């Protein structure tokens, strides 16, 4: 890089690199015979025996002429389970737990765009430390979306800001062009699904962290509807971003993370 046409700005670009834990999914597994407790996208979760599949309560407006609010219940849809021991050291902040399993659920039917807290009402982030007695859960509603189980390899990766060139006073067109070429080399082609823990988010619309300096990306789950993937699509080729405050991360309060959906 230092010998390239952005040599004068190489140090600034290097300083802008953020480590990330890449969730590199493999081909969807037949059935759901992945090892109990293994990291995966889609399929069904392996929950501690004492934990039930999360069910949300929500209010729905019904009636053709005389509208009324009806409280309904329905299960959340399983997205991912990440075995914390699989996450490489140095790819995530030190406050991220090194034991247990992090689970992610979301209402894939109603697909809310903005969830204030992932506490089980529209989405859920759940970290379980005691995972010695796991059982493969049974989906409570066969009519809900079913996503193919994909084993996940968790690897150290790197990210760069996608919106702004991290170089002061760099209005050089050559530098900008090189940076655009560099981004997919560092963090993968733009059109490939990007699932990851931490690092710089690959925003589709505006930066949801721009006015929230105390927050960071926790988990990014991309649309992945190819035949080898879990088969989900968020809006028009969108992405789910789970965002968490540093204080909540340090205290393990994952249910206080918020969720943003962006799409094209």
What are the residue ranges of the model-derived segments?
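Preference for intrinsically disordered or flexible, low-complexity segments
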Residues: 1-264
